[in-house]
Amino acid sequence: MKTVDFPKSLADFLTKYLPGERGMSSNTISSYRITFILLISFMEEYKGIKPQKLVFNDLTKKSIEEFLNYLEQVRKCSVSTRNVRLAALHAFFNFVQYEWPEQLDECRRILSIKLKKAKQGTINYLTVEGIQLLLSQPDLSTKKGIRDLALLALMYDCGARVQEIIDLMPGSIRSNKPYTIKLIGKGNKARIVPLMDEEVVHLKNYMSKNGLSEPYAEMYPLFYNTRREKLTRAGITHILHKYAAMARKCNTGLIPEKISCHSLRQYVEYYNMGSVH
């Protein structure tokens, strides 16, 4: 394997794939970048491999596990920080296995490294189970409940900013495969984000029950209040807090006391960044 393969893949991952295909924020990309700075420094200091000599064959499951232990034992990082670094590595090696099939076997081994469980205490982040519990709260026998499920599930699915959700129109949704949504972000920049089949089911149900698949529906926002006006940031926050409180009553250990719309976005960036193709 040529030495250039690793640096080129890392550069493509950080400068093209994450901002382009995944639409990751600059803060998230910066966090990933720091992960690789730490990894490269570790490989030089503890393995004697100069950065310019580092190749994929040096990055084995064993070396990654040693790096994670180094973060905790030497740098005194928390389990949470360790998991953030591992999530970044998972995202990279998931990307690599499609770009460099020759590395598929070792990539799979690295991807098998599990996130570490922290000691039990007050939860301050959302988990898979927490998200599932939250999304099970809306009453689907009511129009408002159907709307709220579609709203929360969409925020979870695509990791959109609150303002991007507020500005959505029915035409923003591509309801035929491949399912996508067009988000208008800061600076009026548009990005196309794929949607999971499960989310499209919720959206289609909501849109059909509210006439949002009809031509005239473009007069209205996708998510609106009783006056057919756009939901506000405060309104969406109220919806999230309402169902978080309900979910917390079901299981206090799964829903953090402090939860925000940004929490859902962070969840998507943290856990979903690894899905590549």
Each language-model region and where it sits:
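Conserved catalytic core of the tyrosine transesterase superfamily
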Residues: 1-277
